[in-house]
Amino acid sequence: MMRGMGNMQSMMKQMKKMQAQMTAEQAALNEQTFTGAAPDDMVKVTFTGDKKMKDITINPDAVDPDDVDMLQDLVVAAVNDALTKVDEQTQSTMGKYTKGLQ
């Protein structure tokens, strides 16, 4: 009977340790920055790991008052590129904790 309690305590310790590691890795991931770019680097955006936009750079050549749609498309492309990078790194870093839980 006591042996089962020891195993339970050990398992709880391991779970707390894993939770602390997961929290630390998530915090580190949130501090990283990810830059996405539109074709020809006409627009670049930078996000943090928790998907907060930090910066946007627009090449002056991308600004054409007669073609606002192109600039909008470039911004969307850059944002999607950056967010894809965030998602890929998040999966790479945090996936080991969720493997088998899906």
From Swiss-Prot:
InterPro entries registered for this protein in UniProt: YbaB-like_sf, YbaB/EbfC
Taxonomic classification: Bacteria, Bacillati, Bacillota, Bacilli, Lactobacillales
An example Gene Ontology CC term for this record: bacterial nucleoid
Location relative to the cell: Cytoplasm, Nucleoid
GO molecular function: DNA binding
Region ranges (Disordered): 1-24
Similarity comment: Belongs to the YbaB/EbfC family.
Coarse class of the protein's main subcellular location: cytoplasm
Domain of life: Bacteria
Keyword DNA-binding: yes
Alphabetically ordered keywords of this record: Cytoplasm, DNA-binding
Identification of the protein by name: Nucleoid-associated protein lp_0699
Described function: Binds to DNA and alters its conformation. May be involved in regulation of gene expression, nucleoid organization and DNA protection.
Summary of subunit composition and partner proteins: Homodimer.
Species of the source: Lactiplantibacillus plantarum (strain ATCC BAA-793 / NCIMB 8826 / WCFS1) (Lactobacillus plantarum)
Database matches in Pfam families: YbaB_DNA_bd
